[in-house]
């Protein structure tokens, strides 16, 4: 499946719009445990543990987005965007939301 942030796909014609689809992932981070587990990352100014969690959540959200597009009969996604929000206050939860327009191309 072609997944793009652009509204069109070069070399393909959109023949049908299936609608807006979403892929959402809620994840958590145990800040105390992860901080001590990756102290060298934090000292260096970056946290590899958190970057890894965020990357995993992003990949899961895109996989959910693709699954939803297939469910509605699409073979491509256009106008894809990603949003990140913290939630849960001091519990360290965050949500990653992928959105896009499911389309049929030829």
Swiss-Prot record:
InterPro entries: UPF0145_dom_sf, UPF0145_YbjQ-like. Gene3D superfamilies: Hypothetical protein apc22750. Chain B (3.30.110.70). HAMAP family: UPF0145. Belongs to the UPF0145 family. This is UPF0145 protein APJL_0492.
């Amino acid at each position: 499946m072609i997944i793009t942030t652009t509204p069109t796909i070069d070399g393909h014609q959109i023949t049908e719009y299936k609608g807006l689809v979403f892929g959402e992932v809620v994840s958590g981070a145990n800040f105390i445990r992860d901080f001590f587990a990756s102290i060298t990352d934090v000292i260096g100014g970056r946290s590899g543990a958190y970057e890894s969690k965020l990357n995993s959540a992003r990949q899961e959200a895109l996989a959910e987005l693709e699954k939803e597009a297939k469910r509605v009969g699409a073979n491509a996604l256009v106008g894809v965007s990603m949003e990140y929000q913290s939630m849960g206050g001091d519990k360290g939860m965050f949500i990653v939301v992928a959105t896009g327009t499911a389309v049929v191309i030829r």
